[in-house]
Regions:
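Bacterial N-terminal signal peptides that target proteins for export
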Residues: 1-10
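Bacterial N-terminal signal peptides
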Residues: 9-19
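N-terminal pre-catalytic segment of deacetylase/amide-hydrolase enzymes
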Residues: 23-104
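Metal-dependent polysaccharide deacetylase catalytic core of the NodB/CE4 family, i.e.
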Residues: 46-52, 102-104, 124-249
Length: 249
């Protein structure tokens, strides 16, 4: 569930590539795009899911406590890292501004209520920006309905409300990104019956014994992303500028 981040306008990857920045001995004068790439290679992206004190977290293997999260922030600050926003990353990508040598972007996937309850107060207190990416289909049920979460159903109140999302977006600290409308699940990926990520897999049709075409795949993904963008606007949020792919690597 590690994620790579993309700009929705240009679909440009923003990934943690610092370890691979090795200058050539015979390097020539760099063109602007090379310099922009060097900027993004200095960016570290830390991906979180749940930050909660609840022992019954939705995804225990990916959850950390508030104490652990604060210790991460303390360590990063002590070691000279500077927290940056999506705005700053996009400005660096466009060549308008430079990122600090030890820039770090905090990302949070899925849209759990614990983000508002636990993470947001910490970000506000420390004035740290972050990217929060939500799965639209998980937020559509009403408070009386259940959310289909993997192979189980969970209470709607375990996910963020639209009012909470609006408040956090207005704070200027939290960028609300897309984590797809409904691609955070598996689909049939081959004749052997293996389930693979819906966002990156060509769907296999048992009845015709054929795979989804590249065109059909692209249209399916586009429909999903457009639907999530429309859902944002419907609930008073700005259209997302960042896309975090479910199960991306």
């Amino acid at each position: 569930m590690t994620s790579r981040i993309f700009s929705l306008t240009a679909m440009i990857a923003i990934s943690c590539l610092g370890a691979f920045a090795t200058p050539s001995v015979m390097a020539k004068e760099k063109n602007p795009s090379d310099r922009q790439s060097d900027q993004l290679r200095q960016l570290t992206v830390l991906s979180y899911h749940e930050v909660t004190q609840n022992k019954n977290s939705l995804i225990p293997n990916y959850a950390v406590t508030a104490t652990q999260f604060k210790s991460h922030l303390d360590w990063l600050t002590k070691n000279g890292y500077q927290f940056v926003s999506v705005d700053q990353v996009l400005e660096a990508k466009s060549g308008l501004k430079k990122l600090a040598p030890k820039s770090v972007l905090l990302t949070f996937d899925d849209g759990y209520a614990s983000f508002y309850e636990t993470v947001f107060p910490i970000l506000e207190q420390r004035q740290i920006p972050a990217l929060l990416s939500i799965v639209g289909a998980w937020l559509e049920p009403t408070t009386q309905q259940k959310v289909k979460f993997g192979d189980e159903s969970v209470s709607r109140n375990q996910m963020l409300s639209w009012t909470q999302l609006q408040q956090m977006q207005k704070s200027g600290l939290v960028e609300i990104g897309s984590h797809s409308y409904d691609l955070h699940h598996g689909i049939l990926g081959n004749p052997q019956g293996n389930t693979q990520p819906a966002a990156t897999t060509r769907l296999y049709d048992r009845s015709t014994r054929t795979y989804e075409s590249d065109r059909d795949y692209a249209q399916r993904i586009q429909r999903d992303l457009v639907k999530n963008n429309q859902l944002f606007k419907q609930h008073g949020l700005k259209a997302p500028r960042a896309m975090v792919w479910p199960y991306g690597r």
